[in-house]
């Protein structure tokens, strides 16, 4: 009996560009295969927990296969830390299941509400890219359902082209059913954190550059509305996993305790315009002033350090019904002026982004459409109705392209297809791979049609 589908209005986490699709929630790989077979003439895309900010997991008028019912952990090797699980397993589920045994996910983005399949398809990165690379570097294999109905076990050694086309390939080579990941051994579930408050963008970049060798995890929250001599002032947090000896005596009895929970929930409806230049300037001032000028050795929980926004359920609602656009770029080292000029334009136009994050990326990842490259990455959240937003983002596009940089496909919701080739030099390789493994174009999304992927 075919798996039922039902019409559902979908958006990305940014809540822009809603479309209707026929959504199914298969319980196992056989049901996924049946859905793909039945949808050959309509088109299909996989969807996890819906944390892509854009329409990467939307498929207007077509079929969306939601994998969140497929969340079994299939095996674990306590010697190597390799875990095999279904694609719908979330990073939070892995943390909850394996932190008590001393294992953590190798790479975590800013939310733990991401499925393993989605983490591979977006090749997500975290605060440790300079030391650990992106998520797919820690994947040893995955089972991929391709358009011909076959299930292939793909490894970087057996099928490198398909592996690195799928990692960062936004779900367009097939549906990931299962994956094997190498977890990271940790002694505690706490982070030993150092904090520095910087005065301007020069000090911020200098401190970030000096931090790479000493910390596994580093990030800067940046005040995007600061001007003049305070342009780019930031609060930098850097950390490594704590040892048992680093903990307070009372916490040493349960060094691997982990109890994730959202503290509060955002109301179903927030008024439009609550996030604006005036409120963000006030929030930025408070956030900056409350940070210590310098503090070392603070013990933080995983939730506080890695996923502060997960403490608010549906935090995306605070931007109002119009939603928000996240804009994230990376430019090569040597293009520091692009970051400076970006902040100058943002502050001049008073474009409000409270969640403004600056990081350094390490060695580039092998994925054909993987986002990271060695350089500076800046991420910004703007209310969708921000005045002059289209003009501002077009100006930032020019700066990024001129420096040989790129935008993140898991977040972009607006660039035209002609910008893809200069940003992603292996786009032609990806298109050839898609033509080979999916000649009829069974897999597709609103994102892939916009960008001609």
Map each language-model feature to its residues:
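Noncatalytic alpha-helical scaffold of FAD-dependent oxidoreductases
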Residues: 1-453
């Amino acid at each position: 009996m075919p798996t039922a589908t039902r019409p559902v209005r979908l958006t990305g986490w940014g809540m822009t560009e809603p479309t209707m699709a026929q959504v199914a929630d298969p319980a196992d790989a056989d049901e996924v295969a049946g859905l793909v077979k039945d949808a050959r003439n309509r088109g299909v895309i996989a969807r996890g927990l819906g944390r892509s900010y854009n329409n990467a997991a939307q498929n207007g008028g077509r079929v969306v296969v939601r994998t969140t019912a497929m969340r079994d952990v299939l095996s674990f090797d306590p010697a190597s830390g390799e875990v095999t699980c279904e694609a719908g397993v979330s990073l939070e589920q892995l943390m909850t299941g394996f932190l008590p045994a001393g294992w953590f996910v190798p790479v975590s983005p800013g939310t733990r509400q991401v499925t393993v399949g989605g983490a591979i398809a977006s090749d997500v990165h975290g605060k440790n890219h300079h030391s650990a690379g992106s998520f797919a570097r820690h994947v040893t294999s995955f089972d991929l359902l391709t358009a011909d109905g076959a299930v292939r076990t793909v490894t970087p050694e057996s099928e490198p082209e398909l592996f690195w086309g799928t990692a960062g390939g936004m779900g367009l080579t097939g549906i990931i059913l299962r994956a094997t990941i190498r977890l990271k051994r940790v002694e505690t579930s706490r982070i030993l954190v150092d904090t520095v408050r910087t005065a301007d963008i020069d000090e911020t970049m200098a401190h970030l550059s000096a931090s790479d060798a000493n910390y596994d995890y580093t990030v800067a929250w940046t005040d995007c509305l600061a001007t003049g001599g305070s342009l780019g002032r930031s609060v930098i947090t850097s950390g490594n996993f704590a040892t048992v000896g680093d903990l307070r005596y009372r916490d040493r009895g349960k060094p691997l305790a982990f109890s994730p929970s959202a503290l509060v929930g955002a109301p179903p409806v927030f008024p439009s315009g609550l996030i604006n230049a005036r409120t963000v300037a006030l929030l930025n001032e408070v956030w900056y002033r409350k940070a210590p000028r310098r503090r070392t050795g603070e013990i933080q929980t995983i939730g506080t350090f890695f996923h502060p926004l997960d403490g608010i359920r549906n935090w995306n609602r605070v931007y109002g019904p119009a939603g928000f656009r996240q804009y994230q770029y990376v430019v090569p080292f040597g293009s520091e002026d692009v970051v400076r000029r970006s902040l100058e334009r943002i502050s001049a136009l008073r474009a409000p982004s409270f969640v403004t994050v600056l990081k350094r990326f390490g060695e580039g990842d092998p994925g054909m459409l993987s986002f990271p490259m060695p350089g500076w990455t800046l991420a910004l959240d703007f209310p969708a109705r921000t005045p002059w937003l289209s003009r501002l983002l077009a100006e930032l596009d020019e700066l990024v392209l001129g420096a040989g940089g790129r935008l993140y496909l898991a977040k972009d919701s607006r660039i035209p297809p002609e910008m893809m080739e200069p940003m992603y030099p292996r786009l032609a390789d990806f298109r050839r791979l898609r033509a080979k493994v999916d000649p009829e174009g069974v897999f597709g999304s609103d994102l892939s049609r916009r960008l001609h992927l």
